[in-house]
Amino acid sequence: MSNFLPAEEQLALIQRGTHEIISEEDLLKKLKENRPLRIKAGFDPTAPDLHLGHTVLINKLKAFQDLGHEVTFLIGDYTAMIGDPTGKSATRPPLTREQVEANAKTYQEQVFKILDPNKTKVRFNSEWFNQRTAADLIQLASQQTVSRMLERDDFTKRYNNHQPIAIHEFLYPLVQGYDSIALEADVELGGTDQTFNLLMGRTLQGRYGQESQVCITVPILEGLDGVNKMSKSLGNYIGVFDAPGAMYQKVLSMPDTLIERYFELLSFKSLDEIQGLLDEMANGRNPQDLKKILALELVERFHDADAAANAHKGAGNIITEGEIPEGTPEVTISRGEFGGEIFIASIVRLAGLTKNAAQAKDAVSRGAVKVDWQVVDANFSVKENKTYLIQAGKKAIAQVTFTD
């Protein structure tokens, strides 16, 4: 007798937080086979650390894992040395073997903060590509045309703008697609920016005599600026290995407009519980309360319960990055009095972190002022309602909430 939930119930759980399933009919058919499906998601180790944007996809892997399916966390050590052209306006420089191996090791440590290591297969696509010959690669390349590759949005833009496209970049979607053949994947997961690559795998499987995989895309998580996708290079990220206090404060610093989005994509709470919290906020509950609830959940997930309980605290008179000292004052500042935009020197003064305006300006000019642990210069300003942790020097700190 099968231990799987009915296919329709599984589908409903899988649909949560997804952008698109290609196709739901095919997925339902596979689920009705009452067998562990082979679920694949690939990650190119192009940077040493994962952030919460990556975990949206990993959370979906966990959902499949909890339903009893076979999850493969594929580390694209081979494809990382090609460089994924997705969303790029120029050719990405390839990484060295040493960089890839170091990053891959860190990825494994971080992903098991979410996935069960005893139920997760970790594979490297160099396992099969290092065995391929030039003839194999040419045969793979023959499966697609240049015109099909140019249907990809980023390639089209570069072609129309007379920007170079290297031949090896055309190979990337084919190589990623072949990963699905090597793993005989039933389902592949990816971000919405990976749709072209996922569909390539679906197409290639059919041409290589396999049943085509289902492609599931998940949304791209916006960063703390509320505009751009979460990215370490943009400084708008929350790292999986951030210290508890830093993670807690970063969640509190997100714009109110992201609260629903972050709960939907990052929280493991039930949809009913999340909706209840959102209803309370709509009826007047302080948005900061919801941010604290989510912050505590995330700190506990990536650290532990004790870290979550003490995330808002710190020790000693000297401030340690990532630790918010106990008793940190909370200050509210109205932007309306400043025409909607207020610069950092004024913020430091109004928060009581210096005795006067001259000291505030001096602290900023010396690089002694940090916002959410990041040093800022005199051009930093606040134009929206958010909460920041403002630090001036080694001892002065305040949690500042901005209102209209």
Curated annotation (Swiss-Prot):
PROSITE patterns: AA_TRNA_LIGASE_I, S4. It catalyses: tRNA(Tyr) + L-tyrosine + ATP = L-tyrosyl-tRNA(Tyr) + AMP + diphosphate + H(+). The keyword Secreted does not apply. ATP binds at residue 232. It holds the Pfam family tRNA-synt_1b. Keywords: Aminoacyl-tRNA synthetase, ATP-binding, Cytoplasm, Ligase, Nucleotide-binding, Protein biosynthesis, RNA-binding. GO terms for molecular function: ATP binding; RNA binding; tyrosine-tRNA ligase activity. Residues 342-402 form the S4 RNA-binding domain. It is found in: Cytoplasm. Belongs to the class-I aminoacyl-tRNA synthetase family. TyrS type 2 subfamily. Catalyzes the attachment of tyrosine to tRNA(Tyr) in a two-step reaction: tyrosine is first activated by ATP to form Tyr-AMP and then transferred to the acceptor end of tRNA(Tyr). Homodimer. This is Tyrosine--tRNA ligase.
